[in-house]
């Protein structure tokens, strides 16, 4: 089985964190990149030949993959970034389906019987082998993973209409305003998780049909899945049936699309709750990432942290509560950090206050400065989400 990870997304809704990098390369949970979650799921599930399709500002992502995800070449295993190569003419990827069409040489080289096509910017644990087993049993051309979400959230997702058997896909709507609810749960719909398992022949044929359609948007969810649904070749995999070793009742079925600042922030708060909704510390189904060569975190006299994740290399001289700190963060004496996410090498000066904020790497907060204290001033100087999360980009100056 070949794994293809779609990692070329621009991530406009996650600005300014994506101003200098692709969305899958954004830091999450202190030490991880978003792409680490899907790659860990595939590798833990014994899918060991993986191509990561990249395009938008991919240097940070390419470097992370090549320095972190080094598999055993002696066994023919690999995780490799594959940039847009203009194999079908002088054009970049027109959409996720076109990205795979232009990269079909990867499929032809491996000649797998099945292809897993997964997104790169979600936070979750999943054993793809269970989805593959259902796909093989169903005989479908494609199986799409779905998760139940409230109907009110439908405009944010592709919505799957299941058949009476609960497995056949009878319809697909891209971000509908008011879709019908499920027969057994009218308040919910099945949202597509952006994860697909294809029989290779069905995938290749669907991509070529899509390429010949002048009205297509060349998207996996918006084009390929509806096409195969109309042909009666699509099946649904209910994510709630998936189980991984070491999971708890709290994090079983956890999946978050962190494509907006509010969702990104909320997912971090899930990590530091007293009973975390997502457990980063499951050793039976680990999330892998790059190991930094830094000394352990240090707390000086007066340095306090509670309900927080503090990464290696951090120096805490002030007060940190309900926050996630990446490696190398410094919090000086008298400084207060509350409900915030600080990326690598952020420095919070003496007496400064940071509340409800996401600070990208290398941001320097001067002594006595405040973020998250004066809403009017914050709105004039920084990016502020609909939910009130304040975000500063990489290296952004704080007056």
From Swiss-Prot:
Lineage top rank: taxon: Bacteria
General function of this protein: Involved in the biosynthesis of ADP-glucose, a building block required for the elongation reactions to produce glycogen. Catalyzes the reaction between ATP and alpha-D-glucose 1-phosphate (G1P) to produce pyrophosphate and ADP-Glc.
Enzyme Commission code: 2.7.7.27
UniProt binding sites for alpha-D-glucose 1-phosphate: 158, 174-175, 192
Keyword set includes Iron: no
Species whose genome carries this gene: Streptomyces coelicolor (strain ATCC BAA-471 / A3(2) / M145)
Protein name: Glucose-1-phosphate adenylyltransferase
Taxonomy of the source species: Bacteria, Bacillati, Actinomycetota, Actinomycetes, Kitasatosporales
NCBIfam families, sorted: glgC, PRK00844.1
UniProt family annotation: Belongs to the bacterial/plant glucose-1-phosphate adenylyltransferase family.
Assembly, per entry: Homotetramer.
Pathway: Glycan biosynthesis; glycogen biosynthesis
Catalyzed reaction equations: alpha-D-glucose 1-phosphate + ATP + H(+) = ADP-alpha-D-glucose + diphosphate
Gene3D superfamilies to which the protein is assigned, alphabetical: Hexapeptide repeat proteins, Spore Coat Polysaccharide Biosynthesis Protein SpsA, Chain A
A biological process from GO: glycogen biosynthetic process
UniProt keywords, alphabetically: ATP-binding, Carbohydrate metabolism, Glycogen biosynthesis, Glycogen metabolism, Nucleotide-binding, Nucleotidyltransferase, Transferase
One MF annotation (Gene Ontology) recorded for this entry: glucose-1-phosphate adenylyltransferase activity
EC class (word): transferase
Keyword Transferase: yes
Entry-linked Pfam families: Hexapep_GlmU (PF24894), NTP_transferase (PF00483)
